[in-house]
UniProtKB/Swiss-Prot annotation:
This is Fructokinase-like 1, chloroplastic. Residues 58-67 have a biased composition (Basic residues). It holds the Pfam family PfkB. It comes from Arabidopsis thaliana (Mouse-ear cress). Residues 1-38 form a transit peptide. InterPro entries: Carboh/pur_kinase_PfkB_CS (IPR002173), PfkB_Carbo_kinase (IPR050306), PfkB_dom (IPR011611), Ribokinase-like (IPR029056). One of its GO terms (biological process) is plastid transcription. It is found in: Plastid, Chloroplast. The keyword Acetylation does not apply.
């Protein structure tokens, strides 16, 4: 099975197929002592560390009786870690030897997408069919399987950029689920927090543009296991080791995943991690606009770092802000030079205009406009990083799939390597240019996973796009 692959940089792992607890043995020069496990694969098995030290030999590895989930379900209703006694008392005494690069945990759903085969197939079609590419978009002859899901894409892109990432979610125990986990293992993404569901199938999304109304339609197998991850199935070992907890707004569409998400956020804050909210707003997935704003606002107030697009920001603010940006007069309409100095050729929302969305926990807000501009806001300064225009989509050469995920992965990569970027505006802009370069390369290549760049390629493009003083 794909979930049983072991990487050499892992000392221990939690398997979803083998639910026995794993004891971590630490050697010292004076003596050998056994420590209690940090957390079992089902969330139970948390014991007192002092009692384990007095034991002369480890306990048997027999299957233990599963504890009740009354305490863990109570965690789902709590939003403040200080009010939860289990969060305050939890301490397994285990330290992680790998601190560089820090681990990033990506929480959410991983799916199999079926996209037109003319983009992803290894054997391209006849060259004469290139002239009919416009019609192939409306009526593709075949569909090919492609890994999808923003959390898994961000995890893979983060590893490509030189970081360490772990995916936390659930898949079905079928061919699709095995293939997705195997794909992440091949990309060196840790999958010890992945759960397998025997009673449901992995979600499959069939993407096709309907010629009738020109809208994107998605057919999904329900109920997928991605929407049924419970709080008792969280891997606390991964949450403790991760320095950044990343999640996407799509998990808010499932009531079960909502409670599990906020429980995971509580644990991550308890362990000192940063909360990264990647807003993804396909409105057809939501029931109503008011419910969308309400759920996003709840997750928004828990996040330390947020990434949104310009259209998503205007949706959360109000339609009046869209009209203000639309009526903005650029600098090339200025009547004299003094007006040119005070105007820009684009609209940048001021901190006063986004004041209604700001809260005390928020450290960084990034507003993307494709790869053309990245607007950033911190409690002390704000500004814009200029990139390049989005590429033109052509057959068999490039697409924009996964570009936003690459930008998010680039931001998280620099957050782990340069924590002081919150304090210096010049350092902030230099690090965000790296994220812009990652998004540009993802646009230039076909597909999401195949198009994610490496750290060296991203740095090389950054040095080509910007002058040396901006590196």
């Amino acid at each position: 099975m794909a979930s049983l692959l072991i990487f050499p940089h892992l000392h221990h792992f939690d398997s979803s197929l083998d639910r026995r607890e794993v004891l971590v043995v630490r050697h010292s020069q004076a003596s050998r002592r056994f420590l209690t496990p940090k957390a079992s694969i089902n969330g139970s098995g948390i014991t007192n560390g002092a009692a384990a030290e007095t034991t002369s030999k480890p306990s048997r590895k027999g299957r233990k009786k599963k504890q009740t989930s009354t305490v863990i379900e109570k965690d789902n209703t709590e939003t403040d870690p200080e009010l939860n006694p289990e969060l305050a008392d939890y301490d397994d005494g285990i330290e992680f030897p790998y601190d560089d690069p820090p681990l990033v945990c990506c929480f959410g759903a991983v799916q199999k997408e079926f996209v037109p085969v003319v983009r992803v197939h290894d054997n391209p079609m006849h060259p004469d069919m290139y002239s009919q590419w416009k019609m192939l978009q409306w009526d593709p002859p075949e569909f090919g399987r492609a890994p999808g899901g923003p959390p898994s894409n961000v995890a893979i892109s983060h590893v490509r950029l030189g970081g360490r990432a772990a995916f936390m979610g659930k898949v079905g125990e079928d061919d699709f689920g095995d293939e997705l986990v195997l794909m992440m293992n091949q990309e060196r993404v840790q999958t010890r927090a992945v759960k397998f569901d025997e009673n449901s199938k992995t979600a499959c999304t069939r993407v096709k543009i309907k010629f009738k109304d020109g809208k994107m339609m998605a057919e999904t197998v329900k109920e997928p296991p991605e929407d049924s991850l419970f709080a008792s199935e969280l891997n606390l070992a991964v949450l403790k080791e991760a320095r950044i907890f990343h999640f996407n707004s799509e998990v808010l569409t499932s009531p079960t995943m909502q409670s599990t998400l906020f429980t995971a956020i509580q644990w991550s804050k308890k362990f000192g991690g940063l909360i990264f909210f990647d807003l993804n707003l396909p409105l057809p997935l939501w029931r109503s606009r008011n419910e969308t704003r309400k759920l996003i606002k709840k997750a928004w107030n828990e996040a330390n770092i947020i990434e949104v697009s310009q259209q998503e920001l205007e949706f959360l603010l109000d339609e009046d802000y869209y009209e203000r940006r639309r009526n903005y007069t650029p600098q090339y309409f200025a009547e004299d030079f003094d007006q040119t100095k005070n105007r820009r050729d684009y609209y940048h929302y001021t901190p006063e205009e986004i004041k209604s969305l700001w809260h005390d926990k928020l450290k960084l807000l990034v507003v993307t406009d494709g790869t053309l501009r990245l607007h950033y806001y911190t409690p002390t300064f704000d500004g814009v990083v200029i990139g390049t225009e989005d590429v033109l989509i052509t057959p068999f050469t490039c697409d924009r799939t996964g570009s936003g995920d690459a930008v998010v992965a680039g931001i998280m990569r620099k957050l782990t390597t340069c924590p002081e970027m919150f304090e210096d505006q010049d350092v902030m802009e230099r690090q965000l240019r790296f994220a812009v370069a990652a998004g540009i390369i993802a646009q230039w290549t076909i597909g999401a996973v195949r198009g994610f760049p490496t750290e060296s390629a991203t740095q090389n493009l950054k040095e080509q796009v910007y002058v040396p003083s901006m590196w």
